Amino acid sequence: YDDEGERIAGDIESPAQVLATAAEAPNTQTPMTQTPVVQESQALATARQALKDDDYSMDEDIRDIFIEEAQEVLAELGEKIPVWEVDTHELVALKDIRRGFHTLKGSGRMVGAHQIGEMCWAVENMLNRVLDGTLAVSDALVGFIKDTHRKLPTLVEDFQQQRAPSIDPAVTVLQATNLLQQQPINTGLPETNGLDN
């Protein structure tokens, strides 16, 4: 600007000059941190593909009956599992535990709670092997039963609210398969998907 407040022609920057100045200015923005993508294993992908999506088309009254029954079965399992944990040779408690998962499997499939049904079938199938003597009880197996029992109330609540499972049932299915094949329980799982999750 001159003394009269008029803009001097030489002071007017052309669009090209503005762009050039911007290009020369240092970039002060913090680069975005990229979250590493965890590649899902083929085993986990296969377990996931075997799971059917939940179906909420069943009559609401029937779904409510299932929710009530599931809560009762989970309460009973909460009593039986500690008894069996103390003495894993105690077959009465083990049969009761197996029956509880069998009930949840059947009723879950019937009302459209397929994620719960398949999770419980994976456990029931494994316990059948324990009962017929073809699969030995291990600390990992006991921990798996306890962990699955801990997860199920969340899945029951998810189904009641008609929302997608907030816990991945495919993890439980794969862990059961690993135990059946006498492999380390978390084979094929990312480190964050162990028994503590």
Predicted regions: what is each one?
Residues Y1-N197:
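Non-catalytic helical tethers at domain boundaries
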